[in-house]
Amino acid sequence: MLFRGGEEGQIRKNLIENRHIQAIIGLPANIFFGTGIPTIVMVLRKKRDDDKVLIVDASKHFIKDGKNNKLQASDIKRIVDVVSNNRTVPKFSRLVSIDEIRANDYNLNIPRYVDSSEDAETWDVYASMFGGVPKSEVEQLEEYWNAWPSLKAELFRDNGVCYACDHDDIATVVRNNADVQAFIASYGQAISGLPVDLRSRLVEHPEQVDALGQETAIGKELDAMIAGTPLVDPYDAYQKLDDAWGGISIDLEVLGSEGFDAVRAVDPNMVVKKKGGKDVEVQDGWIGRVLPFDLVQRELLHDDLTAIEADDRRVQEIDSEIETILEGFDEDDKQNSDAINQDGDAFVAAELKKAVKAIGKNPASDFERGLVQAQKLFDETKKLKSGIKTKRNALEEKTRDTIKALSDDEARRLLEAKWITPLQKQLEELPNAVIDELIGKVNALKNKYATTYADVCGQIDEAEKELAGMLGDLTGNARDLAGLEELKALLGGE
């Protein structure tokens, strides 16, 4: 379609010469079920005065979703933004003149106009021989040095021809840099007003919110907030918003259709279980229609939840203590005791109880004392698990009653904890992703030239000498020994 001749070529020529093609968008391969071929979107206009065509290569922007590739919301927004603004973006889009297309005989194959491939890795000959980090490769990280002017000098020492990096812990140097810390603080300040704005937009009257319109409006506001922050990709921020919006929009739909009181609704948790060989739907506890039980427990019933978690931790500790007891036993004792399985890695509950009963109150050896202690721990676990089950059931009932009795202010606070707090935390992590990316690149540069060609040759020479020495210990017939002597000579052995 984009480059074949014949009638297809004539169609392309007519569309180009009549200014009907506004944009050609190349999409990733394998995004449609059942076909792995790359696809394109051609944006056509009946009347255009522009003599340029926007060509977009979005083939690298996707995530894996099982066997298929999937466009994320941020990928779609990236495409929409460049097409709406008719904008050239390096390695993504380019405005191509009709004259250039004519010169290419109306061939519209996207790689002819937009090169989205990764730059090939290069190796500096001087640094490969003498070590150090080439200045040209350090300067490729210019966007970071522009954002954090003092960092390059802290990381690299100029030795004239190359840079030297003397730091073992690159991450600490980067994170402690004053400009980097100022960057984190500045970004945090830029988005600090978002929770207040989201409370006003979403939480005050959630039953009246236009979900689709608000996502668009919030996206624009978020974009404006971080517009002055270097390095942070606004499309990454938008993706965080869209990821959160999936759950938020479902809640807004429920509240919009049922009213604010739906926030206090609790429904039977229906699950499918096998009964008499058939799938039967039965109730398994309760779930909040809008507010998850675990959220309510964490925010309003913290003491009850903490008590259960403490018991859970104790059960795990007991498991470790029992394992330690087993590991401390002599192998002969393990093999001669019915209280321990044949593999020696677990107790046999019934036999352990019999053995402890037979031991009585006065164990005569370390092994018997270990068995008694293990039984005590098993008894404690049984009691704890029974108590945990009782506490969980009581907490579930208490959570159900708490949700039903929520005041409007409590309900709004919980909506904020569900919708806004996690999103804000996700957004606050974006600078750390940028910093981690630079740390990875600097470490890669340092390691790339850490071993010089002379070092490699020396290692090879040492390995050859070691191998030649080992060959001298081999024996065989005269024919084999002659071959080994020749190999030793090739390796430089005597």
Language-model regions: role of each:
Residues Q297-V315, F378:
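Short, charge/polar-rich alpha-helical segments
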Residues M1-W286, R314-E317, E327-D330, K334-E494:
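A conserved structural/catalytic subdomain of Rossmann-like adenosyl-cofactor enzymes
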Residues G288-R289, L295-V296:
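Extended alpha-helical interaction scaffolds
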